[in-house]
Amino acid sequence: MQNDVDTQILMKNITKKYGEHLILENIDLQIRKGDFICIFGKSGGGKSTLLNIIGTLENYDSGDLISFSKLNPIRDAKDRDYLRREKIAYLFQNFALVENMTVEENMKLAIKYRKVKDKAGCITSALRAMGVSDKLKSKVFELSGGEQQRVAMARNMVKPFDILLADEPTGSLDYENKMIVIDSLIRLSNEGKTIVVVSHDNDFKQIANKSYLIESASIREMR
């Protein structure tokens, strides 16, 4: 694997342990601009850990993580903060929404410190794209799980990012909401965004241009 201008994330020999338990061992992975990657594997097998390391949300024990064609690995908090703020968006299993706030208030938090001319317009447009613009004034706890997931997707669409990391984005959804989320991911991919999904959903094999399996702390590409 070579670090070229289209490489957004390059992992070299990444190893991660929880205590004495080996989760990931000598992982090599290259994520290039425009990739739609899906990572499969058993529950507890290291998929979410890998995603968190890619997103600089979790440390690793050895190896190197290099981002956006830089020559040197990510080492300090300043680099990690920059990636999280400017380059990477996250879609978590628990949606990471503030339940006692309205949808509008949650959306405003996402762009509070962004230089966006028409924040209200951006919020409305993103919610409309996800089919939840009518929930603007609703409290998050009043929404169904599917609606919360779609709001979480919309929230990611109002902030600038190059890579979207999604942890089981369709795991708890009915078919209708699942297809809305999948269609949104495809649309983002078609717009040039890089998508990395962790999932048990085999439908992603038909969508992703690269699929990987994590097994016994190792990763291999699926054909």
Per-segment meaning from a language model:
Residues 108-120, 129:
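ABC-type ATPase nucleotide-binding domains, specifically the catalytic core motifs of the NBD
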Residues 64-82:
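ABC ATPase NBD Q-loop/coupling interface
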Residues 139-143, 147-149:
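Conserved ABC ATPase signature
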Residues 85, 138-141, 159, 191:
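Conserved signature/switch motifs of ABC ATPase nucleotide-binding domains
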Residues 9, 24-26, 83:
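Conserved structural motif at the start of ABC-family nucleotide-binding domains
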Residues 164-167:
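Catalytic Walker B motif of ABC-type/P-loop ATPase nucleotide-binding domains
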Residues 55:
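Helix-to-loop junction immediately C-terminal to a conserved catalytic motif
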